UniProtKB/Swiss-Prot annotation:
Biased composition regions of type Low complexity, renumbered to the chain: 141-169
Function: Probably acts as an electron carrier involved in oxygen activation and/or lignin formation.
Entry protein name: Uclacyanin-2
Main location, first listed in the record: membrane
Alphabetic keyword roster: Cell membrane, Copper, Electron transport, Glycoprotein, GPI-anchor, Lipoprotein, Membrane, Metal-binding, Signal, Transport
Lineage: Eukaryota, Viridiplantae, Streptophyta, Embryophyta, Tracheophyta
GO CC list: plasma membrane; plasmodesma; side of membrane
Ranges where the record places region Disordered: 129-181
Residue positions assigned to the propeptide: 179-202
All copies of domain Phytocyanin, residue ranges: 30-126
Coiled coil: none
Signal peptide: 1-29
Length: 202
């Protein structure tokens, strides 16, 4: 009888572990690294990406730039006077906490309005149980043309030349690993747990 109770506890524990591991992929936050500089089409970069509550935007930028969290009016008018956050440390991490469109601009005069502007709007949705999408950070080396992530079929992309800013003389760092590999690993753990759980039933 004691063995039967022990087996039931093991099955219950394996089932609980399986349930937790099934939920984990949706709970893994993705960090999107953004090379925050002039001459980048940030609206194009954000298109097609799914940002979720809990994800992190990591802005990397030179000393001539800022990251300001603004409302739609501040975004549209490139006005940071009513910003809720103002950063100038060169490596700013912002947790996406609210569902809806989140707005970011550079408040350095001329940067928000020039060459498409240093402004970013991301639509944030509630978390889900699926694995996160692979983020692709925008990057550009000052003085080097930038192109869209995927050029339109039948035509060639039109490059733009960014204006070099103070403190932005080195090329951007390579993209960071995405959260997608974490999601795949979670599914591997779920599979292993299922096999182990099946062994307990036998």
């Amino acid at each position: 009888m004691a063995m039967n109770g022990l087996s039931k506890m093991a099955v219950a524990a394996a089932t609980a572990l399986l349930l937790v591991l099934t939920i984990v992929p949706g709970a893994v936050a993705v960090t999107y690294t953004i090379e925050w500089t002039t001459g980048v089409d940030y609206s194009g970069w954000a298109t097609g990406k799914t940002f979720r509550v809990g994800d992190i935007l990591e802005f990397k930028y030179g000393s001539s730039h800022t990251v300001d969290v603004v409302d739609k009016a501040g975004y549209d008018g490139c006005d940071a006077s009513s910003s809720t956050e103002n950063h100038s440390d060169g490596d700013t991490k912002i947790d996406l906490k609210t569902v809806g469109i989140n707005y970011f601009i550079c408040s350095t005069p001329g940067h928000c309005r020039t060459n498409g502007g240093m402004k970013l709007a991301v639509n944030v949705v509630a978390g889900s149980a699926g694995p996160p999408a692979t983020p692709t950070p925008p990057s550009s080396t000052p003085g080097t043309p930038t192109t869209p992530e995927s050029p339109p079929s039948g035509g060639s992309p039109t490059p733009t030349t960014p204006t070099p800013g103070a403190g932005s003389t080195s090329p951007p760092p390579p993209p960071k690993a995405s959260g997608a590999s974490k999601g795949v690993m979670s599914y591997v753990l779920v599979g292993v747990s299922m096999v182990l759980g099946y062994g307990l039933w036998m």
